[in-house]
C-alpha cells in the first residue's frame, strides 16, 4: 500500500500546474506542459514500482508472552532487523486493543548499514485486565525518491497478559503477610489447643486425662499422653460468582438510577473485587500454610482448581482468573452444590463471593445450601451497594425523593438481614461487605476461622 508524500504534492503543484496553465494561454508551450506531466508521472510510477516489496529482508520480533499488571506502567518491546543492511527510517505500529493504554501509537526506528538491528519499546499503562493478542504489525517508510509513503503488514505472534493490581488492597491487609517472629507482626491469639495429632510422649504431671492414649498406655504399662498441634495444610476454597449480577458496579445508585462514578473507575465491577480478593486470599493462605483452591461458576461450573500450594499453583489460579468476564446468565446453585458434594470429600472452608440481593437467587441458594453445609464450613460474602442501610441510618434526607430512596435501601438491607438469620440456622455464615474494605474483611474472616479453629 502506498500514499503520496508532501514532496509529491509540491512536485505536482510546481511541475504540472504552472506548465499546464502556461500551455492553456500560450499554445506553443502545450508540448512543454505535456512533457513535464509525462516525466513526473513516469518518475512517480518508477518510484512506486521499485518499492513494491520493500519490506523483504525485514524481521519484526515480539516476545511470545508479555505479562503486565493493571494500572502499572510497563513496556511492550520488539526487535527490528534488516538482513539487507539498508538505510531506512521506519514507522512501526499495530492495532491497539481496548484497555492496553499505549502512550504512543507509532514508534520511529532508524536503521543503517552499520546498525541493522534495533530494539524499540512502547510505553503502556493497561487499565483493564485480560488477554490481548497482537497478530499483525504495520510498517511505513519513504520511497527512494521520497514521493510515496510505502506501507506493509507483517504477521507477528505476541500475547499480552494483564493481571489484576493487588497493590492498594494488599496494603490494607499487610499484617496478614508478616512472618512469625518478625518485628511489627500483628499477633493473633490462638483460642484453645490444636486438634491435629502430632506425637506421643510420656505422661507428665498436669496432663489432662482425656489426652491419655489408653492403648499405648496398656502396651507400655506406663501412662502415655497424646500431643496435639495447631492444624496446618487445611483446604480453603474461594468460590467466585461470575453471573449477571457480578457485572454491576458496587457504587450504588443515585436518584436518577445512575451508578455513582466517583466510587470506582468505569471499568471496575463487582467481579473485579472478587478476583482481587481471591488472589490476595491465596497469598495469605500460603503464608498460613494452608492449601488454596478455586472454583468459578455462573449457570455451570466454569473452572475448578483443586486445593494445593506453591508458586506454580498460584500461577495456575491467576491464569484461571485474569481472563474471567461476567456472563449474563442466572447462577445455578443446585448444579454448583452437587459438584462440590461430589468433588470435595474432605472438610474444607468454602468462601463464597456472590450476590444474594435478588430474592429469587437468594431463595435458590437457601434451598440447596444444606447439601454442603453439614460437611463443610460455608462463609458467604456479599458486597452491598452504597447506601444500603437501615432507614435514616446515616444518609441525610433533604426532600421527599430521598425518603423513597432510603426506604428502598432499607427494604434491601432488611432482606439481606432476614437471609442472614435464615442461613445461620443451617450453619452458614453471611457477611455484608463494603466495597472499600471488602478484601481486608474477607482476609480478617479467614484469620478468625484460623484463630477459633472453626474448621
Feature map (PLM): residue ranges:
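Extracellular/lumenal glycan-associated context and N-glycosylation machinery
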Residues: 1-59
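An amphipathic, basic-hydrophobic helix/alpha-beta surface used to engage anionic
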Residues: 38-312, 347-352, 367, 371
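Short, contiguous acidic/charged loop-to-helix segments that flank catalytic cores in large enzymes
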Residues: 268-270, 324-328, 351, 356-360, ...
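Acidic, Ser/Thr-rich peripheral helices and adjacent loops at domain boundaries
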Residues: 315-317, 387-417
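Short beta-alpha junction loops
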Residues: 300, 383-388
Amino acid at each position: 500500500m502506498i500514499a503520496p508524500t508532501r514532496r509529491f504534492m509540491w512536485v505536482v503543484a510546481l511541475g504540472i500546474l504552472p506548465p499546464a496553465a502556461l500551455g492553456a494561454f500560450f499554445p506553443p508551450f502545450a508540448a512543454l506542459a505535456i512533457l513535464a506531466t509525462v516525466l513526473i508521472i513516469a518518475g512517480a510510477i518508477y518510484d512506486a514500482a521499485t518499492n513494491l516489496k520493500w519490506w523483504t529482508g525485514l524481521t519484526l520480533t515480539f516476545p511470545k508472552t508479555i505479562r503486565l499488571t493493571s494500572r502499572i506502567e510497563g513496556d511492550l518491546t520488539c526487535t527490528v532487523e534488516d538482513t539487507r543492511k539498508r538505510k531506512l527510517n521506519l514507522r512501526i505500529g499495530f492495532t491497539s486493543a481496548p484497555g492496553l493504554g499505549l502512550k504512543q501509537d507509532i514508534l520511529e526506528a532508524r536503521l543503517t548499514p552499520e546498525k541493522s538491528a534495533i530494539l524499540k519499546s512502547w510505553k503502556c499503562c493497561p487499565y483493564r485486565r485480560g488477554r490481548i493478542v497482537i497478530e499483525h504489525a504495520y510498517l511505513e517508510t519513504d520511497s527512494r525518491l521520497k514521493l510515496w509513503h510505502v506501507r506493509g503488514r507483517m504477521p507477528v505472534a505476541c500475547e499480552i497478559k494483564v493481571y489484576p493490581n493487588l497493590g492498594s488492597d494488599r496494603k490494607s491487609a499487610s499484617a496478614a503477610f508478616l512472618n512469625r517472629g518478625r518485628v511489627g507482626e500483628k499477633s493473633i491469639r490462638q483460642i484453645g489447643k490444636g486438634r491435629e495429632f502430632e506425637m506421643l510422649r510420656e505422661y507428665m504431671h498436669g496432663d489432662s486425662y482425656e489426652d491419655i492414649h489408653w492403648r499405648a498406655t496398656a502396651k507400655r504399662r506406663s501412662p502415655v499422653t497424646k500431643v496435639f498441634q495447631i492444624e496446618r495444610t487445611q483446604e480453603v476454597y474461594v468460590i467466585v460468582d461470575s453471573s449477571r449480577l457480578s457485572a454491576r458496579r458496587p457504587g450504588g445508585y443515585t436518584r436518577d438510577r445512575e451508578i455513582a462514578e466517583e466510587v470506582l473507575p468505569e471499568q471496575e465491577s463487582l467481579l473485579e473485587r472478587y478476583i482481587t480478593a481471591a488472589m490476595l486470599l491465596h497469598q495469605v493462605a500460603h503464608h498460613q500454610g494452608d492449601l488454596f483452591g478455586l472454583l468459578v461458576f455462573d449457570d455451570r461450573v466454569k473452572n475448578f482448581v483443586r486445593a494445593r500450594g506453591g508458586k506454580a499453583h498460584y500461577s495456575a489460579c491467576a491464569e484461571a482468573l485474569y481472563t474471567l468476564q461476567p456472563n449474563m446468565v442466572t447462577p445455578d446453585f443446585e448444579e454448583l452444590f452437587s459438584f462440590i458434594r461430589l468433588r470435595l470429600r474432605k472438610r474444607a472452608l468454602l468462601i463464597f463471593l456472590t450476590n444474594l440481593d435478588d430474592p429469587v437467587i437468594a431463595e435458590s441458594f437457601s434451598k440447596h445450601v444444606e447439601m454442603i453445609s453439614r460437611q463443610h464450613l460455608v462463609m458467604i460474602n456479599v458486597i452491598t451497594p452504597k447506601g444500603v442501610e437501615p432507614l435514616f441510618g446515616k444518609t441525610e434526607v433533604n426532600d421527599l425523593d430521598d425518603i423513597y430512596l432510603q426506604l428502598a435501601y432499607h427494604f434491601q438491607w432488611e432482606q439481606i438481614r432476614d437471609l442472614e438469620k435464615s442461613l445461620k440456622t443451617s450453619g452458614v455464615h453471611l457477611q455484608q461487605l463494603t466495597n472499600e474494605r471488602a478484601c481486608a474483611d474477607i482476609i480478617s474472616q479467614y484469620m478468625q476461622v484460623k484463630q477459633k479453629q472453626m474448621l
